[in-house]
């Protein structure tokens, strides 16, 4: 296409645009104009006024009015303030859990414990030492500790008749009057009085006495017999008896050796050197003859 053709096309489009603009700029005919006030057209103002009247008629039957809804929506932030404040207080308490908050909790716990202790029934009695065992209830000692300002310790007992019994008692000597004891009873027994009371309950039991060993003589030897002794472990009495037996055996051995040696010497000595029994040598003759005797020097005496 040439440039002239393009210009003609552009001019044609511009002319049609001008014609359309001229037509649009002209006034419309009255036949095309819509009437402003007609009875057949929709009027929204009248409809809205009718809805308002119906709303006013049904307003008493509504569960919530618009005013209450508005006030509730407005009051929500105000109601949420205490909740937020409570949250702040809780978080503040958590932050101070290792400080004043914890102290406050401990104080409340100690107060509750003190109130429980005050509610427990306590009975204090002053008795003498000989009346300590006159108590009809069975007790078992479970502790003892020193008391500040008193040279005497305090003993703690619990009821031994029943495991679930909460009865307790404390016994301590009165520092002002050492002849008396202060007994403090706490709580009551939840069972009947025991018919038989173990008198050794709460006290240290003495060791059972063992029967004394009996001594029996067999072939002139003392033998110790004890029912409770272990046969594998020798007792002190048995060891002493063994020592005595050894000494007796050694004595008899020496006597036998002396008798044998005496018989051997008597075979090589003259009759003047022998005693009447013939067991031990003895000098009964002349000493000069003994020295001149050749048998004396050649006998067994000098070899012995």
Curated annotation (Swiss-Prot):
GO terms for cellular component: nucleus. One of its GO terms (biological process) is defense response. InterPro entries: WRKY_dom, WRKY_dom_sf, WRKY_plant. The keyword Nucleotide-binding does not apply. It comes from the Eukaryota. Induction: Induced 30 minutes after flagellin treatment. Keywords: Activator, DNA-binding, Nucleus, Plant defense, Transcription, Transcription regulation. Residues 76-96, 185-236 are annotated as: Disordered. Gene3D superfamilies: WRKY domain. GO terms for molecular function: DNA-binding transcription factor activity; transcription cis-regulatory region binding. Residues 78-88 have a biased composition (Basic and acidic residues). Residues 128-194 bind DNA. Transcription factor involved in the expression of defense genes in innate immune response of plants. Interacts specifically with the W box (5'-(T)TGAC[CT]-3'), a frequently occurring elicitor-responsive cis-acting element. Activates WRKY 22, SIRK and its own promoters. Acts downstream a MAPK cascade and therefore might be regulated by phosphorylation. WRKY 22 and WRKY 29 may provide redundant functions. This is Probable WRKY transcription factor 29. The lineage of its organism: Eukaryota, Viridiplantae, Streptophyta, Embryophyta, Tracheophyta. The gene is WRKY29.
């Amino acid at each position: 296409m040439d440039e002239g053709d393009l210009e003609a096309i552009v001019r044609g489009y511009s002319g049609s645009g001008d014609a359309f603009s001229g037509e649009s700029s002209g006034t419309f005919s009255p036949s095309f104009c819509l009437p402003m006030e007609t009875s057949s057209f929709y009027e929204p103002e009248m409809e809205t006024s009718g809805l308002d009247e119906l709303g006013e008629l049904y307003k008493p039957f509504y569960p919530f009015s618009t005013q209450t809804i508005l006030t509730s929506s407005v009051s929500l932030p105000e109601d949420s303030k205490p909740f937020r404040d409570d949250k702040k207080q809780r978080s503040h308490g958590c932050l101070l859990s290792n400080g004043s908050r914890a102290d406050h909790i401990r104080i409340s716990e100690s107060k509750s414990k003190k109130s429980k202790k005050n509610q427990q029934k306590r009975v204090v009695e002053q008795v003498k030492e000989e009346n300590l065992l006159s108590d009809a209830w069975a007790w078992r000692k479970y502790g003892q500790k020193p008391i500040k300002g008193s040279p005497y310790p305090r003993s703690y007992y619990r009821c031994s008749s029943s495991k679930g019994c909460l009865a307790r008692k404390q016994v301590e000597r009165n520092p002002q009057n050492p002849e008396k004891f202060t007994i403090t009873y706490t709580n009551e027994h939840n069972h009947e009085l025991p018919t038989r009371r173990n008198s050794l309950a709460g006290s240290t039991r003495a060791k059972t006495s063992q029967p004394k060993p009996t001594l029996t003589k067999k072939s002139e030897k003392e033998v110790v017999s004890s029912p409770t002794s272990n046969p594998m472990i020798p007792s002190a009495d048995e060891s002493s008896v063994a020592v005595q037996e050894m000494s007796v055996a050694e004595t008899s051995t020496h006597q036998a050796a002396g008798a044998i040696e005496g018989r051997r010497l008597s075979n090589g000595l003259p009759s003047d050197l022998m005693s009447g029994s013939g067991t031990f040598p003895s000098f009964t003759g002349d000493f000069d003859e003994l020295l001149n005797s050749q048998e004396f020097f050649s006998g067994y005496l000098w070899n012995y």
